[in-house]
A protein has these predicted regions:
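Alpha-helical solenoid repeat scaffolds used for protein-protein interaction
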Residues: 19-22, 34
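Catalytic phosphate/nucleotide-handling subdomain of diverse soluble enzymes
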Residues: 45-47
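Outer-membrane beta-barrel pore domains
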Residues: 51-63
Length: 229
């Protein structure tokens, strides 16, 4: 296989004031996956040596996967005074993810109709059998099948959360996240048996609650509850 993964990231943090900071970032990820020529050939024992297995047993396969993935984020952090460890803060921000996927697989099934025996595997070349003359003479048949799909995914998220340390033992975190999900899939697979398009456009509101109680310097108890999809 011929595969390629490229990851590019840029992250920054700006201190706007003593209490207010901005976290921002962006990334572009690219995936390329190619299977240029996978071959499957089945040979069986015969009376005079070997022969190509009859039926739809020989195959050539090509596939290509391309994915572009863009991620962005920006968030404000406002630090609160809690007179304990000063870890209390309020966060507001946005994240976005935009993905384009495409996949195409081409499969050639070669059905052997006539095949002569060959005494040894040494020096045997399949190109001597799979050629235009033998195809025209009906020694084998070719069936072509193409499976493909494309996916477009856009997710916009806005969030707000607050963390406050009431005492040296108690820390509370409350949050609310809003996701707008827009996904579209176009597909034609299973030899045309499954063809169509599906779309998801939905809003999600996702609250969360986290409690932490410090028993001592080394041990603590945590309780978390959240909604996901």
């Amino acid at each position: 296989n011929d595969n390629l993964l490229v990851v590019n990231q840029l992250l920054t943090n700006w201190g706007l004031t003593k209490s207010l900071s901005l976290d921002a970032g962006a990334s572009y990820n690219m995936v390329k996956g190619y299977e240029p020529d996978r071959r499957i050939n089945n040979i069986t024992k015969a009376e005079n040596g070997y022969t190509l297995l009859r039926g739809n047993s020989q195959q050539r396969y090509f596939s290509a996967l391309d994915e572009d993935d863009i991620n962005v984020k920006a968030g404000l952090v406002y630090r609160l005074k809690d007179d304990v460890e000063e870890i209390s803060n309020i966060r507001l921000g946005y994240t976005g993810r935009f993905v384009d996927d495409s996949f195409k697989a081409t499969e050639y099934n070669l059905t052997v109709e006539h095949a002569s025996d060959f005494p040894s595997l040494d020096g045997f070349l399949l190109d001597d059998y799979y050629n235009r003359d033998n195809l025209s003479s009906g020694w084998f048949k070719i069936q072509k099948n193409v499976d493909k799909y494309t996916v477009t995914k856009n997710i916009h998220s806005a969030y707000a959360e607050a963390t406050y340390q009431f005492t040296s033992r108690w820390i509370v975190n409350l949050g609310l996240k809003y996701d707008y999900v827009d996904i579209n899939v176009d597909y034609n697979v299973n030899r045309g048996g499954s063809e169509g398009s599906n779309t998801i456009r939905k809003d999600y509101f996702l609250p969360s609650l986290n409690l932490k109680y410090n028993l001592n310097e080394k041990h603590s108890l945590r309780l978390g509850a959240s909604k996901t999809y």
